[in-house]
């Protein structure tokens, strides 16, 4: 499995600049609405220093980090669900995303127009949330007559109708399904066929002035706008500059802004955490590689991420923790120290497990 994050935001908030920095891919980043007409898709690797060390230990030719896909989606405006701007054409582009990342403008620059004429992070967040909620309302409202008709023929559909009716009420109250479904007792799995947008977790990137990156009082105000969701703060222009610099110059620039690492790295990790994902590792002469699995995945399920045959014919998993392996200095030394163990089908994977699966098909 891989993580896909849909990047949404009002026009001119720095969304495409952020995407360019993420993927080192120069999509059109222009100071006018809808510079992004079709979604740009980029795949980047989850930053993971462990892979470099594994490659050293195993003499790996290649390093393959866990992939993260970012989809840069055309700017939406107030009324998009009713056809304003580019209308709801953007909706189809984010239905397949695992999570929605809202890029919110929190910087002041008179040379960069704001679509609503003023910079207000709270208003921008409300606009985007409202458009996504309205889009889901339309989807549920359109589907309900069909679902009710099906329920008359198939009794098992009654639960789906009840879930859809409860979801409609929640959305009509201005609450996203991700936030409100649990407390309302709505089983979102029953509504999977509707591909509702607000069932996805949201995370937020605040594009702030470089001078505000160390202003904790200001950042706390922004965090409060989206709590309990995760917030990441960065200056998209700085992030764009960082990718053009060598390691020493990049570190100097980061330190000058009070940061220890690029905001992009934090964003990718927050995406993993928000979705409850983790990585396990494999290594050999050909490659050192990270694989993405949900927290709580069993060893056979993790094996299936590599190939379905691995899961179907799973026998055992030879596992050592990354820290134990590095401390030992080699796999043979880790085995001699009793740090390598054989695990069966009920084993729950841990982040940083270094694994070799044994299977028979």
Where are these regions (language model features)?
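Conserved G1/Walker A P-loop phosphate-binding module
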Residues: 1-111, 122, 141-142
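Conserved Switch II/interswitch segment of TRAFAC-class P-loop GTPases
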Residues: 42-47, 74-84, 95-157, 170-184, ...
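Glycine-rich, flexible loop/turn motifs
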Residues: 25-33, 40-42, 50-53, 111, ...
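C-terminal-of-GTPase-core extension/linker across diverse P-loop GTPases
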Residues: 2-8, 13, 19, 146-350, ...
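Short capping/connector residues at structural and topological boundaries
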Residues: 6, 34, 39-42, 49-51, ...
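Amphipathic alpha-helical transducer elements in NTP-driven molecular machines
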Residues: 34, 48-51, 64-70, 84-98, ...
């Amino acid at each position: 499995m891989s993580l896909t994050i849909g990047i949404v935001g009002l026009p001119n908030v720095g969304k495409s600049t952020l995407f360019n920095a993420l993927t080192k891919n120069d999509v059109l980043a222009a100071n006018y609405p809808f510079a992004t007409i079709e979604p740009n898709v980029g795949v980047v690797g989850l930053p993971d220093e462990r892979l470099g060390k594994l490659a050293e230990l195993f003499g790996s030719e290649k390093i393959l980090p866990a992939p993260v896909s970012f989809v840069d989606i055309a700017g939406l405006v107030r009324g998009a669900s009713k056809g304003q701007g580019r209308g709801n054409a953007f909706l189809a582009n984010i239905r397949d995303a695992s999570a929605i990342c809202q890029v919110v403008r929190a910087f002041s620059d008179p040379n960069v127009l704001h679509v609503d004429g003023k910079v207000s992070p709270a208003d921008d967040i409300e606009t985007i949330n409202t458009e996504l909620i309205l889009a889901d309302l339309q989807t549920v409202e359109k589907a309900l007559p069909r679902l009710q008709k099906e329920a008359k023929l198939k009794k098992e559909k009654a639960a789906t109708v009840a879930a859809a009716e409860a979801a409609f009420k929640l959305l009509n109250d201005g609450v996203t399904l991700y936030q409100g479904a649990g407390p309302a007792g709505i089983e979102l799995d029953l509504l999977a066929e509707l591909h509702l947008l607000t069932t996805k977790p949201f995370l937020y990137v605040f594009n702030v002035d470089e001078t505000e990156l160390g202003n904790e009082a200001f950042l706390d105000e922004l965090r409060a706008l989206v709590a309990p969701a995760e917030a990441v703060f960065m200056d998209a222009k700085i992030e764009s500059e960082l990718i053009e610099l060598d390691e020493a110059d990049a570190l100097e620039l980061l330190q000058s802004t009070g940061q220890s690492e690029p905001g992009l790295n934090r964003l990718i990790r927050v995406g993993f955490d928000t979705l409850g994902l983790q990585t396990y590792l494999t290594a050999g002469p050909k490659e050192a590689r990270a694989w993405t699995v949900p927290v709580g995945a069993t060893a056979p399920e993790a094996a299936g991420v590599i190939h379905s045959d691995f899961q179907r014919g799973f026998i055992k998993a030879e596992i050592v923790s990354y820290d134990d392996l590095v401390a030992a200095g080699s796999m043979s030394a880790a085995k001699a120290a009793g740090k390598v163990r054989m695990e069966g089908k009920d084993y729950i994977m841990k982040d940083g497990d270094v694994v070799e699966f044994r299977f028979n098909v």
